[in-house]
Amino acid sequence: MLAAEPRSLLRRLNATCTRALEAAAAACVGARHYEVTAEHLLVALLDDRESDVAVVFGHYRADVEGARGQAKRALSSLRDGNPGKPVFSPLLLEWVQDAWVYASAELGEASVRSGALLVRAALAAGRYFPSELPALEALPSDELRRRLGELARTSAEAAAAAPAGAP
């Protein structure tokens, strides 16, 4: 259930996630889908080689191409033909909200980075993604939750991360 106003929630995304969300929305429009989904955003995050997501996948030697392909297959099954502007999927917004709670409460950060989204997705992929994503589900979610800061310290997002309460 969404507790925050979507617009306020999306403003909590860091620059990397905001760019990925913009790319996800553009892909959605290009495919004439009705909703920007978690799969759209996941594909965009997997495409950014300097994000937390890329660094974490690299650390675990996880199958980036497999995850991208699985998400794209899920997208190919979405209803298309939308002549207008798509909306954000409620599941996408819940994913961002849950990542915001994790980022602020557990990481003490002022914005949502892609690693926080990845942690929430790894912990509860079935909640945000209607299709199975074995490459995502194979990540050691509990370890990732505990060690995200350490694992993603070399990402471009880590350098830009600001603690909660920072200007």
Report each predicted region and the residues it spans:
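Histone-fold recognition with a strong bias for associated Lys/Arg-rich disordered tails
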Residues: 1-167
